[in-house]
């Protein structure tokens, strides 16, 4: 059973789409192993997105991620990383397949509703960034 990190970004939290997005994950067969709402500090956002530090969009991304609360979740399921990315849709909501989260709730490449880990290795790093082992409820399977 794989785990992946999902973040419901400030735009979706602010527009009260949390429940709808969680329902999409659950109806897609994911189990939520951990979840919390928090307001990222500048330091937390910069640390989480440190891999993008040299990219031109870095500061805009940090500013957006600290603009309001986020919901951080550990999703668990078969092939979780790839399936989550499929359910989220393309980074650019205009290119996302109909029915995906970003097609439904995203506005632009920068304001695109959700974040999801892009690999198993990064999922482990990202999960550990936000959650301690005792906060994650593993399935009995």
From Swiss-Prot:
Entry keyword Phosphoprotein: yes
Organism: Chlamydia abortus (strain DSM 27085 / S26/3) (Chlamydophila abortus)
Main location, first listed in the record: cytoplasm
Domain of life: Bacteria
Record's protein name: Nucleoside diphosphate kinase
Cofactor: Mg(2+)
EC numbers for this chain: 2.7.4.6
Protein task: Major role in the synthesis of nucleoside triphosphates other than ATP. The ATP gamma phosphate is transferred to the NDP beta phosphate via a ping-pong mechanism, using a phosphorylated active-site intermediate.
Keywords assigned by UniProt, alphabetized: ATP-binding, Cytoplasm, Kinase, Magnesium, Metal-binding, Nucleotide metabolism, Nucleotide-binding, Phosphoprotein, Transferase
Family statement: Belongs to the NDK family.
